Amino acid sequence: MNITTLTNSISTSSFSPNNTNGSSTETVNSDIKTTTSSHPVSSLTMLNDTLHNIRTTNQALKKELSQKTLTKTSLEEIALHSSQISMDVNKSAQLLNILSKTEYPINKDARELLHSAPKEAELDGYEMISHRELWAKIANSINDINEQYLKVYEHAVSSYTQMYQEFSAVLSSLAGWISPGGNDGNSVKLQVKSLKDALTTLKKNYEDKPLYPATNTVSEQEANKWLTELGGTIGTVSAKNGGYVVSINMTPIYNMLNRLDNLGGNGEVVLDNAKYQAWNAGFSAEDETMKNNLQTLVQKYSNANSIFDNLVKVLSSTISSCTDTDKLFLHF
C-alpha cells in the first residue's frame, strides 16, 4: 500500500466519524513538544514506539475478549487496556500534530536534489503529498478511530455484560425459589413474587441504559447505523431528549415477566411437572437469547480490535519508512 492510498483509506474510512474531538491535540505534553521541535527523527522513533505499545496493549485486550465468560475482573481489565490505548493514541496524535506544523531545515545535498525535481510529482497516477500533510491527515483521524469506533464497542460490551451479570445473580437465586410441591414428586413450588421482583428491578435498572452513544444522543440515522453494527437484536432505537439512542433490548426480560404472570399467581405457585417444564423451557430460551447477543457483541468488538491493530501496524510501517527518508534530509 503506498502512502497516498494509506492516507485516503484513513480519511475516507467508514469508521471515521463526521464529528471530531480536537481536545486531545490541544493540550500537548511539554516533553513531547520539546522532543519533536528539537529532534524530528527522534520524535518519529518515539511515535513508532508508542504505536508498538498500542499494539501490545491491543493484543492483551483481545486476549481478555477471547474468554468464554466475561467477569467483573475481565471488564476491569478491558477498561484498563482501553484507557491505556486511549492515552497512547492521544500521545501519537500529539506527536503527529506537531510534526505537521513544524518546519525543519534540510541539508545541502537534499536541497540540490529537490531543486532538480519537478514541482508536482506523481506516483502510480496519484499526486504525491509531503510528510507534513501525511502527519496532519493521520493526526486528524487516529483519535477519532479510537473514540468513535473501538470505544463504542467497549461501552456496549461493558453495559450489556453488566446487565447479564445481574441476570446471572437472579439465576443463582432462582434455585432457592424452587422447591418440591409435594411428597409425590409430581409438582414444583415456585416463589413467583421473589423472581418477579428481581426481574422487575433488573428491567428498571437497564431498560433506559444506552448501548450507544455512552452520553448525549445522535441522529436517528446514526443510531440505526450503529444498531446494525452492534447486532440488530441486541438493542432498540428510541427517542431521547430530542435525539436518539440505542438502548439495551430488554425483550427477553419482558417475556420472562409475562410468562410469570401467565402462571396465575403472584406469590407461591405450585405447578405440575409438565407445566413447570414448559415454563422453564421458555425461561431458558430467553436466557439463551441474551447469551447469544452478548457473544455476538463480544465477537464484533474483537473484530474491531483486529481492524484497529492492522491499521496501527500499517501506520507503524509507514512511519518507519518516513523516518529513514527524513534522516537523509534533516539536520540534527
Curated annotation (Swiss-Prot):
Biased composition (Polar residues): 26-43
Disulfide pattern: none
Coiled-coil segments: 44-77
Domain of life, source organism: Bacteria
Assigned keywords, A-Z: Coiled coil, Plasmid, Secreted, Virulence
Cross-referenced SUPFAM superfamilies: IpaD-like
A cellular-component GO term for this protein: extracellular region
Pfam families: T3SS_TC
Annotated stretches, region: Disordered: 1-43
Ranges of Low complexity composition bias in the record: 1-25
Location of the protein in the cell: Secreted
Function per UniProt: Required for bacterial invasion of host cells. Controls IpaB and IpaC secretion, and the efficiency with which they are physically inserted into target cell membranes. These proteins are exported via T3SS to form a pore in the host membrane that allows the translocation of the other effectors into the host cytoplasm. Along with IpaB, is essential for both blocking secretion through the Mxi/Spa translocon in the absence of a secretion-inducing signal, and for controlling the level of secretion in the presence of this signal.
Entry text on domains: The N-terminal domain is an intra-molecular chaperone that prevents premature oligomerization of the residues on the coiled-coil region that are involved in interactions with the needle and/or itself. The residues in the C-terminal domain probably form oligomeric structures at the tip of the needle that are responsible for the regulation of secretion of other effectors.
Protein name: Invasin IpaD
Protein source organism: Shigella dysenteriae
Gene: ipaD
